[in-house]
Amino acid sequence: DMLLTTFIVIGLYQLYRWEDKLELKGVPIAIPALLGCAVLTKGPVGIILPLFVFGVYLLMLRKYSYLVIFKALLYAGISSIFLPLLWYVAAWKQGGDTFLNVMLAENFGRFFHLSTPDIHYNLGHENGVWYNFMTLAAGFVPWTIFFFFSLFGLKLHKPEKSVKEILASTWNNIRSMEKEKLFSLVALVCIIFFYSIPSSTVSYTHLTL
């Protein structure tokens, strides 16, 4: 799981550099190598999650057309799946339909809340969205405690703007962020959202954050 986190984090960094330095021209070999290795460690999440984060980031930039974004994600995805596909085909030939059923159940069954009769072991904690935030809060102890104590020092003032104006101002501030900060924020939100979808999860899935 630490290995998966390493490949995803470095892969995200390479995706960011691809846009920042090359403006999506060509696909650096490091991207398919890193994402491919991420797939081999933990399954399709190694490609889906980084490209999901990167796609949202590109949309937030409003610098490229939808077609350019789609082509960039498609090229990165196809090139990244080549290496894992060789391993999956070899494993399928060795394990047959049993391997295929278990692989589909582990990677897609719990994500789409489907029944997984071929799995006879625990896939993780079946808790609500709150579990992700509780795990993150526990992981940042003691800083979480200091954060909650600091809330008592806040001075609240009656807002001079309407809720709509506040939301619009917040959105504009996000859009005007430096690219590094915007990418970090998008990654944070997308990863939390992504891991809130599966019907079961485990605490180490938050290592990417």
Segments (PLM) and residue ranges:
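Multi-pass, polyprenyl lipid-linked donor-dependent membrane glycosyltransferases
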Residues: 1-10, 25, 41-47
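The feature captures the transmembrane alpha-helix scaffold of multi-pass secondary transporters
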Residues: 29-33
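Pocket-edge positions in alpha/beta enzyme catalytic cores
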Residues: 3, 7, 21-22, 121, ...
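Membrane-interface transmembrane helices that cradle and orient dolichyl/undecaprenyl
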Residues: 11-27
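Generic secondary-structure signature for well-ordered alpha-helical cores
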Residues: 17-21, 38, 138
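Alpha-helical transmembrane segments of multi-pass inner-membrane proteins
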Residues: 7-14, 55
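Transmembrane-lumen/periplasm boundary regions of multi-pass, lipid-linked membrane glycan transferases
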Residues: 34, 41, 46-202
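Conserved small/polar residues in nucleotide/adenosyl-binding loops
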Residues: 205-209
